[in-house]
A protein has these predicted regions:
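All-alpha amphipathic helical-bundle segments outside canonical DNA-binding/catalytic cores
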Residues: 168-169, 297-309
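Helical subdomain adjoining the active site within ATP-dependent kinase catalytic cores
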Residues: 296-300, 313-368
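Catalytic activation segment of kinase domains across protein kinase-like and atypical kinase folds
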Residues: 226-254, 263
Length: 368
């Protein structure tokens, strides 16, 4: 699969254009150090919040910024919360976690049509292909190890100390999220997916015991990070739209979904020759995370539940993308392809439930 379609910028599509003069005026008043003639382009990657590259051409050498905004049109409740993105980025930047420098949040729809925020444009590598075909074995391992280090760092930050104690509701995260994504999925439903119906019925009744609360990213994956141009070092973690206070295992298992999705399907690496490529096995990756966070070994059924939940959640997210294509509000020409993955992801989620049932550690499955 070629990832060229996602890389770089493109001219701003008609439905995503806005008044650059009003934006320029806002930036002069709210963005420290900004001056010059503003040029605007749109990033190709992503299907969620429209993201723009802003270039202040009049400054010495030019200065680049990134603008993230809500998409136009009718939106699902609580979706596209760019104000929450800005809040968590600002808090984490203050304690040295790798995020772009935040500049300003604008909640006035009258400036460019929707709420938006502006942050620094971090220059580096965005790696889209988890196979990393142009890297050596040791280089691949170093990239995966850095991803592991950074998500472990996130989950060990004291959310109260960084002012995020009201960023979400502590406790009962999985229960609330299953309810939320059930509602979001049902609001976006365009076809019947039997595996999703089964997950909706089974998951709330089988939540594992034990609860923890940390800052969670919600979409931590390779292509939501920017690596140093030459070093295996993350300079910035991007796309905090789904961030909240939640259970770290739910967040980490989401990050590990790739080991459960066949290679070539939706960022999957299942079936790849891990040792040959220098990619850690899932268990090796879990062990690294546990060591870095001071966590004991994770119960297999607890892990499988979290994996089932996350495959259910991402199926719901992709179904939301499919619905936005139908409604005409999707912000990417490739959103239709992403939205079509919902049935596959739901089936993979149900496979995790079947593993739990074979161990005899979950309630009987609904009739299929």
């Amino acid at each position: 699969m070629s990832f060229d379609q996602f890389v770089g910028t493109k001219p701003v599509e008609e439905r995503h254009r806005f008044d650059t003069a009003r934006l320029d005026q806002f930036m002069r008043s709210n963005v420290e150090g900004y001056s010059g003639t503003l040029e605007v382009a749109m990033f190709k990657g992503g299907q969620s919040n429209p993201t723009y590259k802003l270039t202040a051409g009049g400054q010495a050498g030019g200065k680049n910024y990134v603008l993230r905004k809500k998409p136009p049109g009718k939106l699902l409740p609580s979706a596209h919360a760019v104000d929450r993105e800005f809040r968590v980025i600002k808090a984490l930047h203050g304690v040295g976690f790798p995020v772009p420098r935040p500049y300003a949040l604008c909640e006035d729809d009258g400036v460019i049509g929707t709420m938006f925020y502006i942050m620094d444009c971090v220059e580096g590598r965005v790696l889209w292909d988890q196979a990393m075909p142009d890297m050596t074995k040791s280089q691949r391992f170093a990239i995966w190890d850095e991803l592991n280090r950074v998500i472990a760092q996130l989950h060990t930050i004291d959310y109260k100390a960084v002012g995020l104690e009201t960023f979400g509701k502590p406790g009962s995260y999985l229960e609330r999220q299953i309810g939320r994504w059930t509602k979001q999925y049902q609001a976006s439903e365009t076809q019947k997916i039997e595996a999703m119906d089964n997950l909706i019925a089974w998951l709330p009744k089988n939540i594992p015991a034990g609860d923890e609360t940390t800052v969670v990213h919600g979409d931590f994956r390779l292509d939501n990070t920017i690596f140093h141009p030459t070093e295996p070092r993350i300079l910035a973690v991007l796309d905090w739209e789904l961030s909240t206070l939640g259970h770290p295992l739910a967040d980490f298992s989401y990050h590990c979904m790739s080991w459960h999705i066949p290679a070539g399907k939706f960022r999957g690496i299942e079936g790849m020759p891990f040792e040959e490529l220098g990619i850690p096995t899932e268990q090796q990756y879990i062990d690294l995370y546990c060591k870095r966070t001071g966590r004991a070994a994770i119960d297999p059924s607890t892990w499988d539940f979290n994996m089932a939940y996350n495959l259910f959640r991402i199926a719901g997210i992709t179904q939301g993308i499919a619905k936005r294509v139908v409604d005409g509000t999707a912000s990417s020409a490739h959103a239709l392809e992403a939205g079509s993955k919902a049935p596959l992801l739901a089936e993979l989620g149900w496979l995790q439930v079947e593993k739990i049932l074979r161990r005899g550690t979950g309630e009987r499955a609904p009739s299929r």
